[in-house]
C-alpha cells in the first residue's frame, strides 16, 4: 500500500554504508541487491546512492544504501557519509589479499574515526566467491577478523547472487534487534539522512521487493 506521494510506506528508515578498497565489487553488490542484476562496473567516483524497500517479518523497511569510493583521493569526501549510519558493510575481494589486509589497516580505523553511532552494526563481506580457484583469503581468516572486530560475516558473489540478499538482511535483522538504532530509524523520528550534498552522488535509483 503506497502513501499519498506514491512512495511505499515504511516503519523504519535505515542508513547503510558500503566501504572497502576500489574494485572489490561494492557497486556490483549494491546493484545485485537492489535490481537483481550484475555488471562489471567502473570504480565509483565519490559516492553513489540507492534505495531499497523490503519487508522483514511484519516490518516494512526503507534502506538508504551509500556506496563509497575506495580510492584514497576520495577519502575526505566520503568520510562525512559515516555520520548517522546504522549499518556499515566492509567488503573485500577474496581473490585479492591486499583488500583484506586493508580492512584493519584502513577501513576499521575509518569506522572508529568517522562513525558517529557507537551501536552501529558492522558486517564483513568477502565478495567474488565465484572465483574459488583464485582465492587468496580463506573463509577462516574472514571469520577470525569478524570475531576480532565484532562484525557479522558472510561470503558472497555479486555475480551469481549467492548470499547477496542474506548480507543485507542479516545486517538489518541485527539493527532491528538494537533498540537505540530502531529508535533512530523509526518513521516517526527519522533523520535527514538524504541531505548530504546531492551534487556528490553519481546516481539515484530505487527498487521494491518483499522477503520474509
UniProtKB/Swiss-Prot annotation:
Q: Lipid link (S-geranylgeranyl cysteine) located at?
A: 209-210
Q: Does GTP-binding show up as a keyword for this record?
A: yes
CDD domains in alphabetical order: Rab18
Any idea which UniProt keywords this protein has?
Acetylation, Cell membrane, GTP-binding, Lipoprotein, Membrane, Nucleotide-binding, Prenylation, Protein transport, Transport
Keyword Acetylation attributed: yes
Q: Where is this motif: Effector region?
A: 41-49
Q: Which SUPFAM superfamilies is this protein grouped with?
A: P-loop containing nucleoside triphosphate hydrolases
Q: Which PROSITE patterns match?
A: RAB (PS51419)
User: Which molecular-function annotations from GO does this UniProt entry contain?
Assistant: GTP binding; GTPase activity
Which residues are listed for GTP binding in this entry? 20-27, 67-71, 127-130, 157-158
Superkingdom per UniProt:
Eukaryota
Q: Which Pfam families match?
A: Ras
A GO biological process held by the record: protein transport
| InterPro entries the UniProt entry points to | P-loop_NTPase, Rab, Small_GTP-bd, Small_GTPase
What is the recorded function of this protein according to its Swiss-Prot or TrEMBL entry?
Answer: Intracellular vesicle trafficking and protein transport.
Query: In which family does this protein belong, per the annotation?
Result: Belongs to the small GTPase superfamily. Rab family.
In Swiss-Prot or TrEMBL terms, this protein is called Ras-related protein RABC1
Q: Which organism is it from?
A: Arabidopsis thaliana (Mouse-ear cress)
The record's gene field reads: RABC1
Amino acid at each position: 500500500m503506497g502513501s499519498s506521494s506514491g512512495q511505499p510506506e515504511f516503519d523504519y528508515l535505515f542508513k547503510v554504508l558500503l566501504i572497502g578498497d576500489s574494485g572489490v565489487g561494492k557497486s556490483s553488490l549494491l546493484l545485485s541487491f537492489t535490481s537483481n542484476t550484475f555488471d562489471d562496473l567502473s570504480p565509483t567516483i565519490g559516492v553513489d546512492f540507492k534505495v531499497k524497500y523490503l519487508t522483514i517479518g511484519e516490518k516494512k523497511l526503507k534502506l538508504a544504501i551509500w556506496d563509497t569510493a575506495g580510492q584514497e583521493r576520495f577519502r575526505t569526501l566520503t568520510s562525512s557519509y559515516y555520520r548517522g549510519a546504522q549499518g556499515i558493510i566492509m567488503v573485500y575481494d577474496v581473490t585479492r589479499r591486499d583488500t583484506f589486509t586493508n580492512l584493519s589497516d584502513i577501513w576499521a580505523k575509518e569506522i572508529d574515526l568517522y562513525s558517529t553511532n557507537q551501536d552501529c552494526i558492522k558486517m564483513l563481506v568477502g565478495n567474488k566467491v565465484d572465483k574459488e580457484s583464485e582465492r587468496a583469503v580463506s573463509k577462516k581468516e574472514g571469520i577470525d577478523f569478524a570475531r576480532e572486530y565484532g562484525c557479522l560475516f558472510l561470503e558472497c558473489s555479486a555475480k551469481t547472487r549467492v548470499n547477496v540478499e542474506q548480507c543485507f538482511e542479516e545486517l538489518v535483522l541485527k539493527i532491528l534487534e538494537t533498540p537505540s538504532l530502531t529508535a533512530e530509524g523509526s518513521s516517526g523520528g527519522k533523520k535527514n539522512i538524504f541531505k548530504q550534498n546531492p551534487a556528490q552522488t553519481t546516481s539515484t535509483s530505487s527498487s521494491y521487493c518483499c522477503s520474509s
